[in-house]
Amino acid sequence: MMTPSSTVEHRLAPLANKPVGQLLTHEIYRSIQGESTFAGLPCVFVRLAVCDARCVWCDTPHAFNQGSLASIDDVLSRVLEYRCPLVEITGGEPLLQQEVFLLMNRLADRGLTVLLETSGAHDLGPVDPRVHIIMDLKCPDSGESAANRWANLDLLKPTDQIKFVIASKADFDWTIRTIRAYDLDRRFTLLVSPVFSAPPNSKAPMIQPAELAQWLLESGMPARLQVQLHKLIWDPQARGV
């Protein structure tokens, strides 16, 4: 039987021989931002490969292993070609690659609005303060809630956002308890998103957006309900959108 540590080692294996100064990228493309308070805006996405988490409802498993090497200069050049003022660094888990910190610095130096979407399991300390962080707090039904790095809450800025992906009423109740325990509604913008479109053959629990909307209304919590806009515009299984 594979131990938890060897499982993580296996997940990180694609990065083992990555040259210093290079990023293992999965895809770079322009689309409509589908989440966060930036939803609806044109955005360039830099999706880095490899993730150490395995959320049961993950909609980007294709980024676990597949990637190509690119220098920071190459990535910067490709982003700038789109002439789009908004860029998001996502994954995978982007903070697994140390070069991402310099990439974000250089993107911000060019005057771009830089978003970072991260699982919340890794230290946010080195992130450039100009970057807008969108951090997950993993709910129990994700299978990854034990990896939440609670110390990151003290590293977030008031302009950063915390996202909860909700797959059940139990997840929602956990979210409300967590918000209250850490006074999050007074500190950050909070996003709650339903798992309503899972990958084929996924065993993830799902809920309808209307269910989550009703729970949110009944709770009185000032969180923002979000539905992944890109999945309403295009096929939920489509890539590069």
Across the structure, where does each feature detected by a protein language model lie?
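Conserved Radical SAM active-site core
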Residues: 10-11, 20-23, 27, 42-45, ...
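Generic structural signal for well-ordered alpha-helical scaffold segments
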Residues: 33, 76-80, 180
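Conserved AdoMet/S-adenosylmethionine-binding subsite of the radical SAM
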Residues: 95-241
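Short glycine- and Lys/Arg-enriched binding-loop motifs that mark or flank ligand-binding interfaces
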Residues: 30, 36, 87-88, 240
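Residue-identity detector for threonine
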Residues: 3, 7, 25, 37, ...
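Short hydrophobic/aromatic-rich motifs at helix boundaries and adjacent loops
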Residues: 47-49, 75-76, 147-148
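Flexible, acidic/Gly-rich N-terminal and inter-domain linker regions that tether
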Residues: 1-49, 53-57, 218-224, 233
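Short, mixed-charge, low-aromatic patches
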Residues: 30-37, 60, 129-135, 166
